[in-house]
Curated annotation (Swiss-Prot):
Described function: Component of the ubiquinol-cytochrome c reductase complex (complex III or cytochrome b-c1 complex) that is part of the mitochondrial respiratory chain. The b-c1 complex mediates electron transfer from ubiquinol to cytochrome c. Contributes to the generation of a proton gradient across the mitochondrial membrane that is then used for ATP synthesis.
The protein's assembly and partners: The cytochrome bc1 complex contains 11 subunits: 3 respiratory subunits (MT-CYB, CYC1 and UQCRFS1), 2 core proteins (UQCRC1 and UQCRC2) and 6 low-molecular weight proteins (UQCRH/QCR6, UQCRB/QCR7, UQCRQ/QCR8, UQCR10/QCR9, UQCR11/QCR10 and a cleavage product of UQCRFS1). This cytochrome bc1 complex then forms a dimer.
Pfam families with a match to the protein in the record: Cytochrom_B_C (PF00032), Cytochrome_B (PF00033)
Protein name: Cytochrome b
InterPro entries reported in the protein's UniProt record: Cyt_b/b6_C, Cyt_b/b6_C_sf, Cyt_b/b6_N, Cytb/b6-like_sf, Cytochrome_b, Cytochrome_b_C_euk/bac, Cytochrome_b_N_euk/bac, Di-haem_cyt_TM
Gene it is expressed from: MT-CYB
Length: 379
């Protein structure tokens, strides 16, 4: 009798990806975030689909349609808050996943890494457009401020902004197209995830030591399916705790006020997961310079493989690099804090120092210390 799992054209793909996949025996909990991101994406697509059934992308009715979802639709409130806070969980997992990649040198799988950067940009774009949809004050002004940044591009900037807006300001046309893009992008992300996994399975997973583990592999199922199931349980517990006890903890109170083009909120700021990039943007007095720094704060990940000067792949046995890595984490937390503060002393100078340190650490300090560690190996 033929084994369907191993011979059926579709089941074979699933089998090689999730069941019989040879996996390093020593991968830690830091390797759980890939599957957790998959879970987040599924949650976002399902909750988003149900929200889209009741949402209207018109400036006159968008805000009331979200209110209607929360008040009148069966379990609409929990679907809405699962979607809003699901985005926060998505970004927590994303940041930890990227951090893991940097710490353990996973970026040396350059194809997988580059698709990952594309995914990061796509998720950020999706989250930004999703934040505009409820059409509250912060939605409107956030959209105005961020899209306006494109006007810093020389020569074509102003035309580009008006083209994206579909007029001379953020209005009905902008909201409709943002809804269309917000709906389609998660499916593009899902397709990119498949490519991400395709490239990953070409090489096999990295492991905490950074040493080739071909001699010591175990099947993905049951070992890592059980481990992932525990991760799913922890993530859903955290998400449900957030949704059921303090759903507005990570949101902005200003977004409960309908959008008003004639009234600017005192502090325009994005969701918490964009604050580090927003702080880098604000720390440069020049508009074009700020926009470039904003893009580079994420795009810099693409040159990570080129900046890897160490003879060892992972930071597991490199204490100096480990110290710098955790300084980088602290720096990003500082930037996140600064991004939420008003533009005044002492926050301006702290933001500028933290932004400088971010690029200085990645571009100069970390590669230099890797070279020093190479020398120390010979002592």
């Amino acid at each position: 009798m033929t084994n369907i799992r191993k011979n059926h054209p579709l089941m074979k793909i699933v089998n090689h990806s999730l069941i019989d996949l040879p996996t390093p025996s020593n991968i830690s909990t830091w390797w759980n975030f890939g599957s957790l991101l998959g879970l987040c994406l599924v949650i976002q697509i399902i909750t988003g689909l149900f929200l889209a059934m009741h949402y209207t992308s018109d400036t006159l009715t968008a805000f009331s349609s979200v209110t209607h979802i929360c008040r009148d639709v069966n379990y609409g409130w929990i679907i809405r808050y699962l979607h809003a806070n699901g985005a926060s969980m998505f970004f927590i997992c994303l940041f930890l996943h990227v951090g893991r990649g940097i710490y353990y040198g996973s970026y040396t799988y350059s194809e997988t890494w580059n698709i990952g950067i594309l995914l990061l940009f796509a998720v950020m774009a999706t989250a930004f457009m999703g934040y505009v949809l409820p059409w509250g004050q912060m939605s409107f002004w956030g959209a105005t401020v961020i899209t306006n940044l494109l006007s810093a591009i020389p020569y074509i900037g102003t035309d580009l902004v008006q083209w994206i807006w579909g007029g001379f300001s953020v209005d009905k046309a902008t909201l409709t197209r943002f809804f269309a893009f917000h709906f389609i992008l998660p499916f593009i992300i899902a397709a990119l995830v498949m490519v991400h996994l395709l490239f990953l399975h070409e090489t096999g997973s990295n492991n905490p030591t950074g040493i080739i583990s071909d001699a010591d592999k175990i099947p993905f199922h049951p070992y890592y399916t059980v481990k992932d199931a525990l991760g799913f349980l922890v993530l859903t517990t955290l998400l449900l705790t957030l949704v059921l006890f303090s759903p507005d903890l990570l949101g902005d109170p200003d977004n409960y006020t309908p959008a008003n083009p004639l009234n600017t909120p005192p502090h325009i700021k994005p969701e918490w997961y964009f604050l580090f990039a927003y702080a880098i943007l604000r720390s440069i007095p020049n508009k074009l310079g700020g926009v470039l720094a904003l893009v580079l704060s994420i795009a810099i990940l693409a040159i990570m493989p080129l900046l890897h000067t160490s003879k060892q792949r992972s930071m597991m046995f490199r204490p100096i690099s480990q110290t710098l890595f955790w300084i980088l984490v602290a720096d990003l937390l500082t930037l996140t804090w600064i991004g939420g503060q008003p533009v005044e002393h002492p926050f301006i100078i702290i933001g500028q120092l933290a932004s400088f340190l971010y690029f200085f650490l990645i571009l100069i300090l970390m590669p230099t210390c890797s070279l020093i560690e190479n020398k120390l190996l010979k002592w």
